[in-house]
Amino acid sequence: MFNNKTIVYTSGTFDMFHTNHLKMINYARGLGDVLIVGVSTDELVSSYKAPPIIPFNDRIQLVEALKATDIAIPQHTLDHTEIVKKLNIDAFVVGDDWFGKYDYLEEMGVKVFYFPYGNGISSSSLKKTIYDTYDKHLKAVQQTKPLTIKK
């Protein structure tokens, strides 16, 4: 398919797309000639954590629109064995919150990179901030005395 090209695969949910997602995708882009980005389906994400806020079709369209992305594909499983074989992946990049989970790909000749998110932004932190802000304002509204109009 991509003769004599270094093929890099990265994957994620990419819910509430943010700068750390972009940094990881750009990092992956720099490791090879072709970048394939797997976007986890809503069904896959829901099998191990709360469902995404942003629907799958919107998330994959956003990832496809990035300059760094050559191909965006649905990701239906957390096991990347088949995708590595099918697409002849040379390198795999994933966030360091998955550290150690994909070491098995190295036995298949794939270089595995765990991208350091650091203490920066994450989809989970964004969701928590939104919830906390909403909760704070809701409580403030509930504590406010209703207005009475004098006739």
Give residue spans per PLM region:
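Nucleotidyltransferase catalytic core that binds NTPs
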Residues: M1-K151
